[in-house]
């Protein structure tokens, strides 16, 4: 079986581990700025001004971190 790289999970996990602030753009145009505290296949837990918000991934358009992240991709 071929191992596949899940870029989405690696990206979100790196943002979480490094505590990088991220702007989340929703499909309705709304923006949330905060820190990723966790995620699963369907949701992202974002801390915004000390409060937690659970966002469904199907409502998200874009993640824009405040700075670039570096992560390794296995080949």
Curated annotation (Swiss-Prot):
Alphabetical UniProt keywords: RNA-binding, Stress response
Gene3D superfamilies, alphabetized: 2.30.30.100
Task: Specify the superkingdom.
Answer: Bacteria
Please give the InterPro entries that the UniProt record associates with this protein: Hfq (IPR005001), LSM_dom_sf (IPR010920), Sm (IPR047575)
PROSITE patterns in the record: SM
* Cystine bridges: none
The Gene Ontology biological process annotation of the record reads:
regulation of DNA-templated transcription; regulation of RNA stability; regulation of translation, ncRNA-mediated
- Among the entry's GO cellular component annotations, what is one? cytosol
Q: Which GO terms describe its molecular function?
A: RNA binding
Every copy of the Sm domain together lies at 9-69
Q: Kindly indicate whether the keyword RNA-binding belongs to this entry.
A: yes
Subunit-structure text: Homohexamer.
UniProt family annotation: Belongs to the Hfq family.
Q: What does the function comment of this entry state?
A: RNA chaperone that binds small regulatory RNA (sRNAs) and mRNAs to facilitate mRNA translational regulation in response to envelope stress, environmental stress and changes in metabolite concentrations. Also binds with high specificity to tRNAs.
How is this protein named in the record? Answer: RNA-binding protein Hfq
Gene assigned in the entry: hfq
């Amino acid at each position: 079986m071929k191992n596949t790289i899940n870029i989405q999970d690696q990206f979100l996990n790196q943002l979480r581990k490094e505590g990088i602030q991220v702007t989340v753009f929703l499909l309705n145009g709304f923006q949330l700025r905060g820190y990723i505290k966790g995620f699963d296949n369907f949701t992202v837990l974002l801390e915004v001004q000390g409060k937690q918000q659970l966002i469904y991934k199907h409502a998200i358009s874009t993640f824009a971190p405040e700075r670039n992240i570096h992560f390794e991709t296995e080949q």
